[in-house]
Amino acid sequence: IYPKDGIPYIESPYITDYGILDRMEPVNVKKNHRIQVFAQAADILSKEAENLVPLEASIGGPFTIASNLKGVEYLLRDCRKKPEEVHRLLEIITQTQMSCIEMAAEYGMGIAMADPVANPALIGPKMYEEFVFPYTKQLTDYTVKKTGKKVSLHMCGNTYSIWKYLVQYELNELSLDNIIDLQRAVEKIG
């Protein structure tokens, strides 16, 4: 929903039954109108701003996108009750994001990723290890392979319990929440 004087919001989850995954495929970025509008803008930026400023395409982390499609409370419940279905959804999302990364690479862009729902305060380190780390790792590695650039990542909240995962990502920048002791982050993460 796009209110005239407010921020957009999702009225109800798109995925109410995981049976829809049987018919879902990763988004074809070459045929998706909305993504093609982005591609046109990226083309202009790459020609006009190249070598002036760093260019990055912003993508959502797979877990946050899954929460937008399923609803946060339902996704968190299903991580316990239907983990195999959550993994199926995350795989489709990750494949779509890989296509977006390929497109960004065509324009010499790096990748900035935010995954606010992957906050350990919401999911804890064990769920992070199972449902976030493998997909984010896959995307950060893929970004370096396709773009030659490491990822800028933003993580909300108290992330101390997942630092052992964050250091394994291919990152050029890590944006942490204001509650984090930055001196400690420099010492432990770099």
Q: Predicted regions span which residues?
A:
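Active-site loop segments of alpha/beta catalytic cores
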Residues: I7-E11, V27-G190
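Acidic/glycine-rich phosphate/pyrophosphate-binding loops and surrounding catalytic core
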Residues: M24
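Alpha/beta catalytic barrel-like cores
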Residues: I1-I20
